Amino acid sequence: MRLTEFWQRMAVAFGPHSESLAEYHVFSQLGGRTIRQALADGEQPKGIWRGVCEALEVPAHQR
């Protein structure tokens, strides 16, 4: 998954809250990091997206 696709999926799933979610929400599925921290640490967007979907119970049709 490309980074642009990741951000598109975030926007569809979380709308205007996607940016603050990425900046401030700490996910146990991402090793106790935020989305931005995980990306900065070199994690792949696809793995991050899977963690976000699991944590926030994103509906299957949006995954």
Where do the protein language model's features map onto the residues?
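C-terminal alpha-helical interaction appendages
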Residues: 1-63
